[in-house]
Amino acid sequence: MAKGRKLPSVMKNRFSEVPTATIRRSSFDRSHGYKTTFDMDYLVPFFVDEVLPGDTFSLSETHLCRLTTLVQPIMDNIQLTTQFFFVPNRLLWDNWESFITGGDEPVAWTSTNPANEYFVPQVTSPDGGYAENSIYDYFGLPTKVANYRHQVLPLRAYNLIFNEYYRDENLQESLPVWTGDADPKVDPTTGEESQEDDAVPYVYKLMRRNKRYDYFTSALPGLQKGPSVGIGITGGDSGRLPVHGLAIRSYLDDSSDDQFSFGVSYVNASQKWFTADGRLTSGMGSVPVGTTGNFPIDNVVYPSYFGTTVAQTGSPSSSSTPPFVKGDFPVYVDLAASSSVTINSLRNAITLQQWFEKSARYGSRYVESVQGHFGVHLGDYRAQRPIYLGGSKSYVSVNPVVQNSSTDSVSPQGNLSAYALSTDTKHLFTKSFVEHGFVIGLLSATADLTYQQGLERQWSRFSRYDYYWPTFAHLGEQPVYNKEIYCQSDTVMDPSGSAVNDVPFGYQERYAEYRYKPSKVTGLFRSNATGTLDSWHLSQNFANLPTLNETFIQSNTPIDRALAVPDQPDFICDFYFNYRCIRPMPVYSVPGLRRI
């Protein structure tokens, strides 16, 4: 063989290859309608369809939605929103891949044991069946039919979509998304997973969508997402700095307990029971030298500076010249053993504080954290989360109806009522899929947010530091005060003795109030006005001071005051889905022997 030449490999063969599966696809028109009623603010699942690998879906929708008859033609915007997601089955069930493939272990060749087989997680309808207007109803499951089985994956998908796209992680706990072979039972009170005898099946619920973000709803519950960052002062080998008290109060027999601002030992006119550094001496009788802690005087325990509880061994005696004098308690810190903060420690503290502040503002979901800290968008597929496909937005048009028939005291001529509807046609998405899963469509209706009970921040500028200064523009978050959303008398105090008006409701970026202007509601449009006309609008009206929590962040439009019949569903809708599906299957399934 010539130098440098190589012999061909004898292992060149086709045994490491398999033929490519070439599956012909066919197009199907799967257009259909969906008629329903629903209430504002809820996330209603109005579309669900299973997906096969190799599918391509193209979806458009046309709708006619009517709002229940209005008392007056309201002066507010109502927005109808549809949003569609793809949720792979592997995110909803841990054993999906083993189920659909039969398993990737050698036992799959020989096992005939049914225990090794998987079945799709399923639940059974309860006694009395599912109620109308429940999440089960909107998914299309039969209502008022008891004890029939159905799979649970689309319901798990709803909870997962809510957690990933709608939940405010600063204020709301995540919904349970079980991925095992069955949904566990839960405690009927707490909703937590439980193995107790009184545990009940988990009931999936229709969730409210959250309010759109504004000055109040985007407020943060704290200055940063994490512990406050301190600048430490170190001291001595012990890591402690000594604090010395210069005086303590006395206790005389029959003296009132309110003389004490902190506890000491009981006092005898002839003995001193404290050393110079504040520790007990042997004057306590049965109490050893150096004992520290609390002990009762007249059955009242007064805390000491140093630790555990000691027993009382005597009774206080009267004395006109007590060895300890009542008065203030000046103390000082001995900094001789301390060391200063280094510049590097200061840098670390400032940078960590900025990291906590950025995490609070951008969010803590992985995709949000990567986007906020690195400026990189992490695709839904790579983040192992539901994939947003597309959606639509349309406004509800309000049309006045003028009374032009006979006049009476209830409805004179020229009286205005109204009807409202939304009609639109939108292309939603075209998407090809490579794995099994579900397409879930969610429908919701929300109104613009306005407030009418707060004091705009500009009216509370009393100090020059309350005004904008460029020097302070990049300081940390600033408080949004309770009075800005719900103003009360300054005499209303909280348990700590602070005026409730001046207690923080939440926190916003520095000088956020200069960057937006709140809408106003005045005159008889105010809900607290005598003879109010608030049925003309949908501004928020709080019965009590709201708190920045899960209840506040959920959308709760006061639509009932504007409706002629508030106990009926807010909307009645008719949807038509123009739905084209290209699927890896023949146009017709013709029985025969052509494949054998």
Curated annotation (Swiss-Prot):
GO MF annotation: an example: structural molecule activity
Keywords: Capsid protein, Host cytoplasm, T=1 icosahedral capsid protein, Virion
Keyword Oxidoreductase tagged: no
Domain of life, per lineage: Viruses
A Pfam cross-reference name: Phage_F
UniProt similarity note: Belongs to the microviridae F protein family.
Protein name as catalogued: Capsid protein VP1
Native source species: Chlamydia phage 1 (Bacteriophage Chp1)
